[in-house]
Amino acid sequence: MFPIKKRKAIKNNNINAAQIPKHIAIIMDGNGRWAKQKKMPRIKGHYEGMQTVKKITRYASDLGVKYLTLYAFSTENWSRPKDEVNYLMKLPGDFLNTFLPELIEKNVKVETIGFIDDLPDHTKKAVLEAKEKTKHNTGLTLVFALNYGGRKEIISAVQLIAERYKSGEISLDEISETHFNEYLFTANMPDPELLIRTSGEERLSNFLIWQCSYSEFVFIDEFWPDFNEESLAQCISIYQNRHRRFGGL
């Protein structure tokens, strides 16, 4: 065990470099409440949350995390006020316009999961360009869950399998967990070992509900804009001190 140092010293967080989770998923919660506490508009909370994404992406990359999946916008978030939704749809472009050169320099690959075709054209354009420009990178894969819902993902997978079964392309005997995984957005990714949710809420909110069957959950009270490198180190330390049994002893 030895300390992992960030650019600004991390206090008393020893994490084992040999046991860094390959895939960390984060429900970035609390932007609006953070802003309300500070008597600021909700969109200011989302802006500050974007700065946190940059910090955490840098640190996860430095630690050697292979996949970092961030719940950016759910299929349920369309019900929020129109001006807030419009701002959230603008954020991916703002983020990538300012951060993409650094992502390329750090060998980070950008990916998305979710029903991307239903996003506004300018949002799709920004993320598709980032994916194209980073597709050959081999470091951290930064995955944005955009217009993502776990139940809708599962239903979509079932529909695709049913169509293939109906057409005679597959038999019932071929349908297994492994086969089912191939129809999910995350088909080419390992399941998350660690799921983190900020803001004190303790639920999945329809995020990676199939993939997180055996993930370790860490719920912390900090709002997402306050989450930093030390916070992530603490979450990883908690994960490393748990025993993952996968239903065994």
UniProtKB/Swiss-Prot annotation:
Query: Matching Pfam families, A to Z?
Result: Prenyltransf
InterPro entries linked: UPP_synth-like, UPP_synth-like_CS, UPP_synth-like_sf
| Sites where the protein binds Mg(2+) | D29, E216
Q: Which cofactor does the UniProt annotation name? A: Mg(2+)
Which top EC class is named for this enzyme in its record? transferase
SUPFAM superfamilies documented for this protein: Undecaprenyl diphosphate synthase (SSF64005)
GO BP annotations, alphabetical order: polyprenol biosynthetic process
Q: Which GO terms describe its molecular function?
A: ditrans,polycis-undecaprenyl-diphosphate synthase [(2E,6E)-farnesyl-diphosphate specific] activity; magnesium ion binding; manganese ion binding
Q: Write out the entry's keywords from A to Z.
A: Magnesium, Metal-binding, Transferase
Its protein name is Ditrans,polycis-undecaprenyl-diphosphate synthase ((2E,6E)-farnesyl-diphosphate specific)
* Source species: Micrococcus luteus
